[in-house]
Regions:
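Histidine/lysine/aspartate-rich catalytic loop segments that bind and position anionic ligands
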Residues: 88-131
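Short catalytic-loop micro-motif centered on adjacent basic/acidic residues
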Residues: 38-41, 82-83, 124-125, 150
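Conserved N-terminal beta1-alpha1 strand-loop-helix module at the mouth
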Residues: 1-78, 97, 157-158, 165, ...
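Short acidic, glycine/proline-enriched helix-loop-strand junctions
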Residues: 57-58, 95-104, 144-152
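Glycine-rich beta-to-alpha transition loops that act as phosphate-gripper elements at the mouths
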Residues: 18-21, 62-68, 84-87, 104-110, ...
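Glycine-rich phosphate-binding active-site loops on the catalytic face of alpha/beta enzymes
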Residues: 80-91, 124-133, 166-189
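A charged, well-structured terminal subsegment
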Residues: 138-143, 187
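Catalytic cores of alpha/beta
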Residues: 67-77, 110-119, 142, 155-171
Length: 200
């Protein structure tokens, strides 16, 4: 298990940034770090990955990967984790060859089980709000408690404890922590999110 994966299990909060501007993404990443999140998924391109990978004690995850070519570019830019928004099995070869862990996404129980079968350490469950939040996680894990699932998609701070108590290993947080917020507000909200996760 790599340090990036260990950190997700420890913090239980996985920070996601969806910003086109690399400078803005860099600012948000620093706010996440100050608030206690060390594993950060970037969906805003290679330039942002390169910049954020330079932040000390931060593990950059490259999000939105569909093709092997995208994965290779992310690794070259400094990504320590590969993340696909779909069940893209072809990426397991890149992950195995590079020894960079891979997170695949699932919506159905069959997809989640298929991801587990190829030894994906964490399975992103997306979009959790539309699937039924904590109730869906409970139902999904009832027959498959061996799955490490991380719900993402419109998750708010008040959803954190119910999702974790339902059996999720971590929760992905996106724009709710930074959209329309100042740097200090993002730090404060991030600290709240991390604190909530530790109470679960």
């Amino acid at each position: 298990m790599t340090q990036a994966i260990k950190e997700i299990f420890k913090t239980k909060i996985y920070g996601i940034i969806r910003e086109d501007d690399p400078e803005k993404a860099y600012e948000i990443a620093n706010a996440y770090k100050e608030g206690g999140i060390k594993v950060i998924e970037i969906n805003s391109g290679i330039d942002a990955i390169k910049k954020i990978a330079q932040i000390e004690d931060i593990y950059v995850a490259q999000g939105g990967i569909i093709t092997s070519e995208q994965a290779h570019k992310g690794i070259e830019a400094g990504a320590k984790l590969l993340v696909s928004p779909i069940l893209q099995m072809g990426l397991t070869k890149v992950s195995s060859a590079s020894k960079i862990p891979l997170i695949l996404s699932a919506t159905t129980p069959n997809e989640a089980y298929s991801a587990w079968k190829v030894r994906v350490p964490i399975i992103k469950i997306f979009p959790i709000k539309d699937l039924g939040c904590s109730t869906y996680i409970e139902d999904l894990l009832r027959p498959m408690r061996f799955l490490n699932v991380m719900p993402c998609g419109s998750v708010k701070i008040e959803h954190i404890r119910p999702l974790l108590n339902a059996g999720a290993c971590a929760v992905g947080m996106v724009r709710g922590l930074y959209l329309g917020k100042s740097y200090d507000e993002t730090v404060k909200l991030t600290k709240e999110a991390v604190s909530e996760a530790q109470k679960a």
